[in-house]
């Protein structure tokens, strides 16, 4: 009986202790921040993986699969290369005088005229591509003593033999081929591009039958340059039934300069000039289809959005494009440090502040208050601190994009086989640039993430310190982001603390009085735990004693018999 009385006393003593919200003369106010059940891991300067409530992917890793035809003017080369369209290959006649922002060459493109080579193919291709036009002006060259408009069965235009429409094949007239000397001044205010060529017969007999002389010569010059080409007579691999070749050359004549052409044979003469323009047109090899859509950035894989600062779709781009990096993902923190809320808050449902964990379910703000008082519990967001954090984070993505997006195109680099060492060097330089940009991108994102997390933590601390300064000695910091308020604080009082109109002096006397009364009888939480554990142990011990006594009594009365066999 004495034991039962003692246990009852202990139980009543435990239940009689003050817990947050149980006493009408006190209240608990906690400050906290938004949290989500599953956050996003980002990298910072000091931490390789830190969880935040929200993050934005910065690397565009996929394309639309098609090249958008807006806002850039796309010219689909179909089965023509740009050089074939430039020369006037019969199957490319549809490209005459075309213009473009981006000329798209296809892998299925082919030549269907006299076999030729361009010693400086990459330079000519790049020059014409950047000009963005095939606008051609015929000029009245006078070729005296020779036959013009030569053709070949390898270059049919319809059923008849033909030739490149922008070139004029000259050969002997009768049995003579006189020395040609023609001049053409540039009296306009723009650069003119002249395309010309030299014919290389496959045999000496072909040479004399076309040009009379056993060896011809072609010299093309301006005030700034001169090119002299001697034909190389000899058989080459057969292409479209021919073992002879044409070498294509080009000359730019500046305003006020003069084009001079001198030849005694083998000349493939120009018919006029291409009007050169300056701009940011380009060329790209791609088999992606042309689609009706809008995109500022184009890659060989297709168009990509440029709303991210980085991309790893393709190194070759045209337009305002994200910077190419090696990383598949770089996440920019756009939310605060995430500390998911603990689902269990103990037997008495105590609330906790930001130092212990975040709060899930705060949909109207990033920072806020929770309270327990005589009127129950409640939660409200602090819009001012929330807006302060959002204002500083907003625009962060745009600032990163402004730092990284290229407002120009990254063209393809091409070199002939004899320029192999230059090509290797160029590849090394490009790879080094990509490595540097990839490192810079990762560092930039890590710095921004560190700043975001420090910023959001700072706003939380500012709000906590602001609340502490209001309450002063009327409340006690509980160490977990909460304050125990030592006076009756109804919902209106809590609201005044939140909006900064709390009057400390009004509650000062009541708070001091309650603090001294409560402190005088308050048991520390450690003693409460010990009392609970001791009372539980004693109860278990008494239960065992009663059960053992009952068994012994039953055995003595004969109601229970125990046999032990050996």
UniProtKB/Swiss-Prot annotation:
The record marks 345-346 as: Cleavage. Glycans are attached at residues 24, 38, 54, 97, 181, 301, 499. GO terms for cellular component: host cell plasma membrane; membrane; viral envelope; virion membrane. Coiled coil: none annotated. The chain crosses the membrane at residues 531-551. InterPro entries: Capsid_hemagglutn, Hemagglutn_HA1_a/b_dom_sf, Hemagglutn_influenz_A, Hemagglutn_influenz_A/B. GO terms for molecular function: host cell surface receptor binding. Disulfide bonds join 30-482, 68-293, 80-92, 113-155, 297-321, 489-493. It is found in: Virion membrane; Host apical cell membrane. Palmitoylated. In natural infection, inactive HA is matured into HA1 and HA2 outside the cell by one or more trypsin-like, arginine-specific endoprotease secreted by the bronchial epithelial cells. One identified protease that may be involved in this process is secreted in lungs by club cells. The keyword Transferase does not apply. A lipid is attached at residues 555, 562, 565 (S-palmitoyl cysteine). Gene3D superfamilies: 3.90.20.10, 3.90.209.20. It holds the Pfam family Hemagglutinin. Its main location: virion. Keywords: Clathrin- and caveolin-independent endocytosis of virus by host, Clathrin-mediated endocytosis of virus by host, Disulfide bond, Fusion of virus membrane with host endosomal membrane, Fusion of virus membrane with host membrane, Glycoprotein, Hemagglutinin, Host cell membrane, Host membrane, Host-virus interaction, Lipoprotein, Membrane, Palmitate, Signal, Transmembrane, Transmembrane helix, Viral attachment to host cell, Viral envelope protein, Viral penetration into host cytoplasm, Virion, Virus endocytosis by host, Virus entry into host cell. Residues 552-566 are cytoplasmic. Residues 1-16 form the signal peptide. Residues 17-530 are extracellular. It is a single-pass type I membrane protein. Homotrimer of disulfide-linked HA1-HA2. Major glycoprotein, comprises over 80% of the envelope proteins present in virus particle. This is Hemagglutinin. It comes from Influenza A virus (strain A/Memphis/102/1972 H3N2). The lineage of its organism: Viruses, Riboviria, Orthornavirae, Negarnaviricota, Polyploviricotina.
């Amino acid at each position: 009986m004495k034991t039962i009385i003692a246990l009852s006393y202990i139980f009543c003593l435990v239940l009689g202790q003050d817990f947050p919200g149980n006493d009408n003369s006190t209240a608990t106010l906690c400050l906290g921040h938004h949290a989500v059940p599953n956050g996003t891991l980002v990298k910072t300067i000091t931490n390789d993986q830190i969880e935040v409530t929200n993050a934005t992917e910065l690397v565009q890793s996929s394309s639309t699969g098609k090249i958008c035809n807006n806002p850039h003017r796309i010219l689909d080369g179909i089965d023509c290369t740009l050089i074939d369209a430039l020369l006037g290959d019969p199957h490319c006649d549809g490209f005459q005088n075309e213009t473009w922002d981006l000329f798209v060459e296809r892998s299925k493109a082919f030549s269907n005229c006299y076999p030729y080579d361009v010693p400086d193919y990459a330079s000519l291709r790049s020059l014409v591509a950047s000009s963005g036009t095939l606008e051609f002006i015929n000029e009245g060259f006078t070729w005296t003593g020779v036959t013009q408009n030569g053709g070949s069965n390898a270059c049919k235009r319809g059923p008849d033999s033909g030739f490149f429409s922008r070139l004029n094949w000259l050969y002997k007239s009768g049995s003579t081929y006189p020395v040609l000397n023609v001049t053409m001044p540039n009296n306009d205010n723009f650069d003119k591009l002249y395309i010309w060529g030299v014919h290389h017969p496959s045999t000496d007999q072909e040479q004399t039958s076309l040009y009379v002389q056993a060896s011809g010569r072609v010299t093309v010059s301006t005030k700034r340059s001169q090119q002299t080409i001697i034909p190389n007579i000899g058989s080459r691999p057969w292409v479209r039934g021919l073992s002879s070749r044409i070498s294509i050359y080009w000359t730019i004549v500046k305003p006020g300069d003069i084009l001079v052409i001198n030849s005694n044979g083998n000349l493939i003469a120009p018919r006029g000039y291409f009007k050169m323009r300056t701009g940011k047109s380009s060329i790209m090899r791609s088999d992606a289809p042309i689609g009706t859509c809008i995109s500022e950035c184009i890659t060989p894989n297709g168009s990509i959005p440029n709303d991210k600062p980085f991309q790893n779709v393709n190194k070759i781009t045209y337009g305002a494009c994200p910077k190419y990096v090696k990383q598949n993902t770089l996440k920019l923190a756009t939310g605060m440090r995430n500390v998911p809320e603990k689902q269990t808050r103990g037997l008495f449902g105590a609330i906790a502040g930001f130092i212990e964990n975040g709060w899930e379910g705060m949909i109207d703000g990033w920072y806020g208050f929770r309270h327990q008082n005589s009127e129950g519990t409640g939660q409200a967001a602090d819009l001012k601190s929330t807006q302060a954090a959002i204002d500083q984070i907003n625009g962060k993505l745009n600032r990163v994009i402004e730092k990284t997006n290229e407002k120009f195109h990254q063209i393809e680099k091409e070199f002939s086989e004899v320029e192999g060492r230059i090509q290797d060097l160029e590849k090394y330089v490009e790879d080094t640039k990509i490595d540097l940009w990839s490192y810079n991108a990762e560092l930039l994102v890590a710095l921004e993430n560190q700043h975001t997390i420090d910023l959001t933590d700072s706003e939380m601390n500012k709000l906590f310190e602001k609340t502490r300064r209001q309450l002063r000695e009327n409340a006690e910091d509980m160490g977990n982001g909460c304050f125990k308020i030592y006076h009756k604080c109804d919902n209106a009082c809590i609201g005044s603390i939140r909006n900064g109109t709390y009057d400390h002096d009004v509650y000062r006397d009541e708070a001091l009085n309650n603090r001294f009364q409560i402190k005088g009888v308050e048991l520390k939480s450690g003693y409460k735990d010990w009392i609970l554990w001791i009372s539980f142990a004693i109860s278990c011990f008494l239960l065992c004693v009663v059960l053992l006594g009952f068994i012994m009594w039953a055995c003595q009365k004969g109601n229970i018999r125990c046999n032990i066999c050996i």
